């Protein structure tokens, strides 16, 4: 069977080695005679898995001891509301930096829950010579008392990534759903990090929360118990039955990432993949990208064909060539190639080859 390369933005492809291991032990995990999906989440065997998963993630991301690591339900959208309910209380205020579709969605959820009086926002994307560019504000010049400032360093729909470190007088809450573990970051700069698992961690249904201990002392609102960070900490992420199979696969992904050299190693590969694809786009008038070079996403490369009437043919022929899920988000159209950690370099080489051949054929 010819290789199939899945460029889906999420749920995304998982490392082949992880999928094969899961396949091999699907019916008999860890010598238990049953699947990991079938054992109790409170069994000593599964507890050992969860402890190892947390230890591996802490090692990979260099998470300080004063941070809690939570494995929760709800994905990124679930965390949009959890952040508000856990930190704002009845009269707290927050600032949302808007750089694309996902930060806009987080803002909308915060406004719905807390109201405009408690939520401020700043649009941080401008047009530079017709291209989208991020301009980070000097937050120290803002005279306000915020419980936190929220931002999304990588916008999957818009193909925008913020590489500069955000400097803030208030705790930083970051949606790292699409960029977690793709490059090294300093966790100690953040009050809270959250990430839906379905891009760089595992299957959908699980979200990772990394929260600094002092954040848990902020006033909270009455909310669903399963989204209460304090309860999650108190019960080791097991206040209720967690998504055990997703947790298991996340643990396997962490182990895989460690085996190939960790985040520093995969970051070099990710940079190489993105540079290769952007070079193909830039060297060919048949394709175009709408983001300044300094803010082009390494995880989600968006591009358009010069002749949009060829979009359907491009996708059809790409599918035949084993290059799937390249259609851009319905909001922006065009194409999108998601290059998460599990995407091998060979997949990008195959995509670039196809794009060059398609351009030569239809130019």
Curated annotation (Swiss-Prot):
Pathway: Amino-acid biosynthesis; L-serine biosynthesis; L-serine from 3-phospho-D-glycerate: step 2/3; Cofactor biosynthesis; pyridoxine 5'-phosphate biosynthesis; pyridoxine 5'-phosphate from D-erythrose 4-phosphate: step 3/5. The keyword Cytoplasm applies. L-glutamate binds at residue 42. This is Phosphoserine aminotransferase. The keyword Acyltransferase does not apply. It comes from Shewanella putrefaciens (strain CN-32 / ATCC BAA-453). PROSITE patterns: AA_TRANSFER_CLASS_5. Pyridoxal 5'-phosphate binds at residues 76-77, 102, 156, 175, 198, 240-241. Its EC number is 2.6.1.52. Homodimer. It is found in: Cytoplasm. InterPro entries: Aminotrans_V_dom, Aminotrans_V_PyrdxlP_BS, Pser_aminoTfrase, PyrdxlP-dep_Trfase, PyrdxlP-dep_Trfase_major, PyrdxlP-dep_Trfase_small. One of its GO terms (biological process) is L-serine biosynthetic process. Pfam families: Aminotran_5. The gene is serC. NCBIfam families: PRK05355.1 (NF003764), serC_1 (TIGR01364). The modification N6-(pyridoxal phosphate)lysine is found at residue 199. Binds 1 pyridoxal phosphate per subunit.
């Amino acid at each position: 069977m010819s290789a199939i390369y899945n460029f889906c933005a999420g749920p995304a492809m998982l490392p082949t080695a992880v999928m094969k291991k899961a396949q091999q032990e699907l019916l008999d995990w860890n010598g238990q005679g049953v699947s990991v999906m079938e054992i109790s989440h409170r069994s000593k065997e599964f507890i050992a898995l969860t402890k190892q998963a947390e230890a591996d993630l802490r090692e990979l991301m260099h998470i300080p001891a004063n941070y809690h690591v939570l494995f929760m339900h709800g994905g990124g959208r679930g965390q949009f509301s959890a952040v508000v309910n856990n930190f704002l209380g009845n009269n707290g205020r927050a600032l949302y930096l808007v750089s694309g579709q996902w930060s806009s969605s987080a803002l909308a959820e915060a406004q719905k829950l807390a109201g405009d009086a408690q939520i401020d926002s700043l649009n941080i994307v401008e047009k530079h010579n017709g291209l989208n560019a991020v301009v980070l504000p000097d937050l120290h010049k803002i005279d306000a008392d915020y419980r936190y400032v929220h931002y999304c360093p990588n916008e999957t729909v818009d193909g925008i990534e913020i590489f500069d470190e955000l400097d803030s007088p208030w705790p930083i809450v970051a949606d790292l759903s699409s960029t977690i573990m793709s490059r090294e970051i300093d966790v100690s700069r953040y009050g809270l990090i959250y990430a839906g698992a379905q891009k760089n961690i595992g299957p959908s249904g699980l979200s990772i929360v990394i929260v600094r201990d002092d954040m848990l002392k902020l006033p909270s609102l009455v909310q669903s118990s399963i989204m209460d960070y304090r309860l999650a900490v108190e019960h080791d992420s097991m206040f209720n039955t967690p998504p055990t199979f997703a947790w298991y696969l996340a643990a396997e992904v962490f182990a895989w990432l460690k085996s190939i050299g960790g985040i520093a190693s995969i970051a070099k590969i990710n940079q190489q993949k993105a540079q290769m694809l952007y070079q193909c786009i830039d060297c060919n008038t048949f394709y175009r990208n709408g983001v300044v070079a300094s803010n082009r996403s390494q995880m989600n490369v968006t591009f358009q064909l010069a002749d949009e009437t060829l979009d359907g043919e491009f996708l059809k022929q790409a599918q035949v060539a084993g290059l799937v899920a390249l259609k851009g988000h319905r909001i922006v159209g065009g194409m999108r190639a998601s290059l998460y950690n599990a995407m091998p370099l060979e997949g990008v080489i195959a995509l670039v080859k196809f794009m060059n051949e398609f351009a030569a054929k239809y130019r």
